[in-house]
Amino acid sequence: VYKRQISVSTLLWADLENRFVWIALLGIWLFGLIGWRDDYAKVIKENSTGMSAKRKFQYQSIAAFIIVLLLYATNQSANDTLLIIPFIKPEIFSFDLRTWHLYPIFAYLVIVGTSNAVNLTDGLDGLAIVPVVMISGALIIFSYVTGIEFWSERLLFPHVGGAAELSIFCATIVGAGLGFLWFNTH
């Protein structure tokens, strides 16, 4: 249900010609399908453990590989693959992940690691949506700053054209997450 609200809101408000928007939507659907498959195994098949960790990791790896492939294939500038420390001049520290083809490996680890981090926090209180809302709120700012040249220059972020549209995607995650929390209070 959650991915539907995010998708509809994103499709209504985001620039649909932006590659990041479509890749983000694909990512949320791929990982949402993995979660659905796990819940299906738990509820319908009455298997309390759901999918095995190995199977989940395999599905996550396939989804991450597809996302990384799309990001790498549509790379438009050197800043798309630049690793930086925020608020530090790129001249002082920056590393182009295209060197030795590290970008696909790094992006894969970030995507799968982030997915599993959310799953690990879910076991703590049953509502993984709270950290998702908080992180998405921060990502609204980072994606906007990175995507707008005026702000990226002043705050020492590399400018990535089109990244500002991801702030809309992240805002839809925050909105859907807050709606989910409100729904669960009753």
Regions found by a protein language model. Give the residues of each.
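Alpha-helical transmembrane segments
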Residues: 3-33, 67-69, 73, 78-83, ...
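Membrane-interfacial loop-to-helix junctions in multi-pass inner-membrane proteins
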Residues: 17-25, 44-59
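Alpha-helical transmembrane segments within multi-pass membrane transporters and channels
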Residues: 31-41, 45
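Alpha-helical architecture
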Residues: 36-37, 54, 58, 120, ...
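Active-site His/Glu-centered metal-binding helix of metallohydrolases
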Residues: 37, 41, 62, 124
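Membrane interface segments of multi-pass transport proteins and intramembrane proteases
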Residues: 42-52, 86-95
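Alpha-helical transmembrane segments and their helix-start/interface "positive-inside/aromatic belt" motifs
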Residues: 51-63, 125-131
